[in-house]
Amino acid sequence: MKPTVWHHLRLCPHGHPDETIDDAAIAVDETGTIAWLGALSALPHGYAHWRREDLHGAWVTPGLVDCHTHLVYGGTRADEFAQRLAGVSYEEIARQGGGIVSTVRATRAADETTLFVQAAARLQPLLAEGVTAIEIKSGYGLDLASERKMLRVARQLGERFPVTVHTTFLGAHALPPEYAGRADAYIDEVCDRMLPTLADEGLVDAVDVFCERIGFSLAQTERVFEAATRRGLPVKLHAEQLSNAGGTALAARYRALSADHLEFLDEAGIEAMKAAGTVAVLLPGAYYFIRETQLPPIELLRKHGVPIALATDHNPGTSPLESLLLTLNMGCTLFRMTVPEVLQGVTRHAAAALGRADRHGALEVGRQADFAVWSVGSLAELAYWIGRPLCEQVVRGGTTVFRRMNG
């Protein structure tokens, strides 16, 4: 690529709307790395001969990060949506053989090509909203071959689309039917066979567990964490969504990258997260979709200074959400977060939840030039508008990979 100076832009380099530069410029070298940024009036003379790209006063933020998704799976669960509307709880559906296990059946039956095509269709709306990094979990295979298939598809998405994909092995997502009544035996399989094999194949960036009364116990979760730690892999946790099971404190002991959901999180768990540097990932799409009433403890998270990230939690059962911008709005309207909080929640803090705050979530000299260009008058509009296409252009590694066509 040709070295380029992107200029006449309003720059928000760290995702905080109170830290901006008017009439700014970003100089990107031939490797796609940011060589300089700041006020256009201070642009060094050495960049005078570089190609110019005029953004006509548009806002520029770091590329967005969706740090919790289950994007690869077979089928849908629209029928269960109707059941929930009729009063059947998520837990009841799961106990009747629905829920996660129904998606497991569909995912096992699908081949890699089918899973790729379906996941690609879910990914593209996110890319058109400025997402340049995304986490994709496994967890709908629940056997070695199917978990491998999911993670291979996730890797392929990162190779064939302009987005950095971080993969998370979530083999301990639910108990597969063939292990009914034998949860400890299944955890043996996860720890002794599935995780080592998939890690050796280079398919795993992090390890997650669903720690809940309808998922896995603290003791079982710790076994998975121990297996991940032996492999040098960071851990994450689905925690305190339906009850306070104490999973967050356990995650903090293992210095988890993040603990996610957290509606029933208590102050002791928050203190443990703060001490461990664990990010709180809140998922308002799931809260909305399954009509939860227990709000996550936003004020306590603020009080203790725990970084808060937001994500779509895209999945077929509890959050079939394909808009990170709508997630911003939900964070404000449902969880009473501020605009600075939600914007940092999908940039700097979301990157930290992936363990890659050094790579994503900010625009700084020496970093890859991943940024989004917005047709808004103020950054508050990113959380304000519902359904309006706001992203005009996405740049990844200094190259435009998306441009909205007018009309």
Curated annotation (Swiss-Prot):
One protein family per Pfam: Amidohydro_1
Annotated Zn(2+) binding sites: 68, 70, 238, 313
CDD domains per the UniProt record, alphabetical: Imidazolone-5PH
Known catalytic reactions: 4-imidazolone-5-propanoate + H2O = N-formimidoyl-L-glutamate
Single biological process term from Gene Ontology: L-histidine catabolic process to glutamate and formate
Keyword Heme applies: no
UniProt keyword Hydrolase present: yes
Matches recorded under Gene3D superfamilies: Metal-dependent hydrolases, Urease, subunit C, domain 1
UniProt remark on cofactor binding: Binds 1 zinc or iron ion per subunit.
The entry's keywords: Cytoplasm, Histidine metabolism, Hydrolase, Iron, Metal-binding, Zinc
Positions of 4-imidazolone-5-propanoate binding: 77, 140, 173, 241, 318
InterPro entries on file: Amidohydro-rel (IPR006680), HutI (IPR005920), Metal-dep_hydrolase_composite (IPR011059), Metal_Hydrolase (IPR032466)
Entry binding sites for Fe(3+): 68, 70, 238, 313
Pathway(s) where this gene product acts: Amino-acid degradation; L-histidine degradation into L-glutamate; N-formimidoyl-L-glutamate from L-histidine: step 3/3
Cofactor: Zn(2+); Fe(3+)
EC number(s) given by UniProt: 3.5.2.7
GO molecular function, one term: zinc ion binding
Enzyme class (EC, first level): hydrolase
Binding site for N-formimidoyl-L-glutamate: 140, 315, 317
Predominant localisation class: cytoplasm
NCBIfam families: hutI
Functional description taken from the UniProt entry: Catalyzes the hydrolytic cleavage of the carbon-nitrogen bond in imidazolone-5-propanoate to yield N-formimidoyl-L-glutamate. It is the third step in the universal histidine degradation pathway.
Family, similarity comment: Belongs to the metallo-dependent hydrolases superfamily. HutI family.
Name of protein: Imidazolonepropionase
Organism: Burkholderia cenocepacia (strain ATCC BAA-245 / DSM 16553 / LMG 16656 / NCTC 13227 / J2315 / CF5610) (Burkholderia cepacia (strain J2315))
Gene name for this UniProt entry: hutI
